[in-house]
From Swiss-Prot:
Organism: Homo sapiens (Human)
Extracellular side: 22-239, 278-296, 479-498
Gene responsible for this protein: CHRNB4
Name used for this protein in its record: Neuronal acetylcholine receptor subunit beta-4
Residues spanning the membrane: 240-255, 262-277, 297-321, 455-478
Site residues, Key residue that facilitates effective access of the conotoxin BuIA to the channel binding site: 82
Length: 498
C-alpha cells in the first residue's frame, strides 16, 4: 500500500516526459523538414518569381546612447534592429507537428536580407550577435539582433555647449536593391521602451524615414535621425562660469587705481587665463573651419575686450603720469574731462575747501620801503610795542586802538638806515623767491592733480563702456541658442514616411 503513491507519481512523470519528448521530437522533425537541403537554400531570395519584391519591415529600438565623440565625429549607440519578412518556404501545418506554431532557427541557416549600417565609422557593418530567428507557421520571420554601432555624425559646433545635433543611422541591404526587396518602417519613430538615459545627452526625437531616389529606381534605404540635445550643466560649471568670472576680473582693471602699479599685471594675467580656456576648447571640438563654437566666440570676444583694456590702461597710465614740464593741458580737455564728463559718470571732485589749508603764523610786522619818519619817539615805546612801522601812513592805518603813533628820531634812522636797508632788501628778495617758488609749486601740483583726475575720468568712462559691451555681448551670444530649432535632415532625395 505504501508503494501506491510512488507508483502514481512515477507514472505521471513518465507521462509528462513522454509528452515533452514528443514535442521535442516534433520540433526536431519540423526543423529537418523545413531546412532540408533538397528543399531549402539559404542563399536564394524567398520569392515565387523574379519580379516579386520581398517586403522587409524595420524598426530600431534604442537601448543606450553610449557616447558622442565631437572631435572624431562618431556616435556610438547600443540598438536592436528589428526585422520582419515572410518566407513562403518556412510554412507548415501545425497539426502535423504536435501543434507547434513557433520555431526558433539559427540565423545562419535561413535566408537573411543582409541589411547593414551604411554610414558606419569603424568598419563593422553587420550586427554584433546573430541571434535565433522566430519563425511562425504562416512563414513570417522575426529577427531582433542586438548591435553596437559606431556611425559617422557631422557635428555642428556653432552653439557648443548649448548645441543640438542630428546624427543619422542609414540602413540598406548590401547586395539587394529596390527591384528585389523593399524596406518599409514598422513605426514612424524608433522605439525607446528599453532606453537607458544618458548623462550628457537628451533624446529630442528619433524619427525614421524611407528614402528613395526618383532618378535611380534601384535605390532604397531606411534612415533614423537621432536628434539629441546636449546637457550643458557640465560645461557651464567647468567652462562658462570660469570665463565669466575671468571677464569680471577684467572689469576690475578699470577700477584699480593707477598709483598701485598693478593694472597691466592684472590685464595680462586675465588675457593668459582666457588663452588657456581657448586652448582647452580646441581639444574638445572638432578641428573644423566651417564654424566657430559659441564658447570660442565668447572667449575671442572677451580676449578682444581684455586687449582693449590693456590699450586703455596704457593710455590711462600715460595721462596719469603727465606733468606741466612735459605736457600742456588743452582747454577742451579741461572742459570735457574736468567739468562735463564727471557729472555724467557720477563723479564728484573734492573742492578746495575740503583740502587741509596750509597753516602760516600770523604776520606781526609789515615792512615797506624805509622813509625818514617812524612811529616811536622813545626807546621804551619803540622796544615795548609789538610792532613798528617805517611808513608813517602805515603807522596811521595799522596802529592799535588807544595807541599814539610816534616818530623814530631822525638821527637814529640815519645812523642805521644803511645797514637796515641792505638787510631788509635781502630779506625781501628771499621772501619773494620763496613765495614765488611756493606759488609755482602749487600751480604745478594743481596741474598734476588735474592730469590725475583726467586719468581717473577716462578710467571710469572705459569702465562703463566695458561693462555695457561685456553684458550686451554675453547676452547676445548666449541668448539665441535657447531659442534654436532643429529639423530632421531630409537627405539628398525625397523621403517618404510610412
Amino acid at each position: 500500500m505504501r508503494r501506491a503513491p510512488s507508483l502514481v507519481l512515477f507514472f505521471l512523470v513518465a507521462l509528462c516526459g513522454r509528452g515533452n519528448c514528443r514535442v521535442a521530437n516534433a520540433e526536431e522533425k519540423l526543423m529537418d523538414d523545413l531546412l532540408n537541403k533538397t528543399r531549402y537554400n539559404n542563399l536564394i531570395r524567398p520569392a515565387t518569381s523574379s519580379s516579386q519584391l520581398i517586403s522587409i519591415k524595420l524598426q530600431l529600438s534604442l537601448a543606450q546612447l553610449i557616447s558622442v565623440n565631437e572631435r572624431e565625429q562618431i556616435m556610438t549607440t547600443n540598438v536592436w534592429l528589428k526585422q520582419e519578412w515572410t518566407d513562403y518556404r518556412l510554412t507548415w501545418n501545425s497539426s502535423r507537428y504536435e501543434g507547434v506554431n513557433i520555431l526558433r532557427i539559427p540565423a545562419k541557416r535561413i535566408w537573411l536580407p543582409d541589411i547593414v549600417l551604411y554610414n558606419n565609422a569603424d568598419g563593422t557593418y553587420e550586427v554584433s550577435v546573430y541571434t535565433n530567428l522566430i519563425v511562425r507557421s504562416n512563414g513570417s520571420v522575426l529577427w531582433l539582433p542586438p548591435a553596437i554601432y559606431k556611425s559617422a555624425c557631422k557635428i555642428e559646433v556653432k552653439y557648443f555647449p548649448f548645441d543640438q545635433q542630428n546624427c543619422t543611422l542609414k540602413f540598406r541591404s548590401w547586395t539587394y536593391d529596390h527591384t528585389e526587396i523593399d524596406m518599409v518602417l514598422m513605426t514612424p519613430t524608433a522605439s525607446m521602451d528599453d532606453f537607458t538615459p544618458s548623462g550628457e545627452w537628451d533624446i529630442v526625437a528619433l524619427p525614421g524615414r524611407r528614402t528613395v531616389n526618383p532618378q535611380d529606381p534601384s535605390y532604397v534605404d531606411v534612415t533614423y535621425d537621432f536628434i539629441i540635445k546636449r546637457k550643458p550643466l557640465f560645461y557651464t560649471i567647468n567652462l562658462i562660469i570660469p570665463c565669466v568670472l575671468t571677464t569680471l576680473l577684467a572689469i576690475l582693471v578699470f577700477y584699480l587705481p593707477s598709483d598701485c602699479g598693478e593694472k597691466m599685471t592684472l590685464c595680462i594675467s586675465v588675457l593668459l587665463a582666457l588663452t588657456f580656456f581657448l586652448l582647452l576648447i580646441s581639444k574638445i571640438v572638432p578641428p573644423t573651419s566651417l564654424d566657430v563654437p559659441l564658447i570660442g566666440k565668447y572667449l575671442m570676444f572677451t580676449m578682444v575686450l581684455v586687449t582693449f583694456s590693456i590699450v586703455t590702461s596704457v593710455c590711462v597710465l600715460n595721462v596719469h603720469h603727465r606733468s606741466p614740464s612735459t605736457h600742456t593741458m588743452a582747454p577742451w580737455v579741461k572742459r570735457c574731462f574736468l567739468h562735463k564728463l564727471p557729472t555724467f559718470l557720477f563723479m564728484k571732485r573734492p573742492g578746495p575747501d575740503s583740502s587741509p589749508a596750509r597753516a602760516f603764523p600770523p604776520s606781526k610786522s609789515c615792512v615797506t620801503k624805509p622813509e625818514a619818519t617812524a612811529t616811536s619817539t622813545s626807546p621804551s615805546n619803540f622796544y615795548g610795542n609789538s610792532m613798528y612801522f617805517v611808513n608813517p601812513a602805515s603807522a596811521a592805518s595799522k596802529s592799535p586802538a588807544g595807541s599814539t603813533p610816534v616818530a623814530i628820531p631822525r638821527d637814529f634812522w640815519l645812523r642805521s638806515s644803511g645797514r637796515f636797508r641792505q638787510d631788509v632788501q635781502e630779506a625781501l628778495e628771499g621772501v619773494s623767491f620763496i613765495a614765488q617758488h611756493m606759488k609755482n609749486d602749487d600751480e604745478d601740483q594743481s596741474v598734476v592733480e588735474d592730469w590725475k583726475y583726467v586719468a581717473m575720468v577716462v578710467d571710469r568712462l572705459f569702465l562703463w563702456v566695458f561693462m555695457f559691451v561685456c553684458v550686451l555681448g554675453t547676452v547676445g551670444l548666449f541668448l539665441p541658442p535657447l531659442f534654436q530649432t532643429h529639423a530632421a535632415s531630409e537627405g539628398p532625395y525625397a523621403a517618404q514616411r510610412d
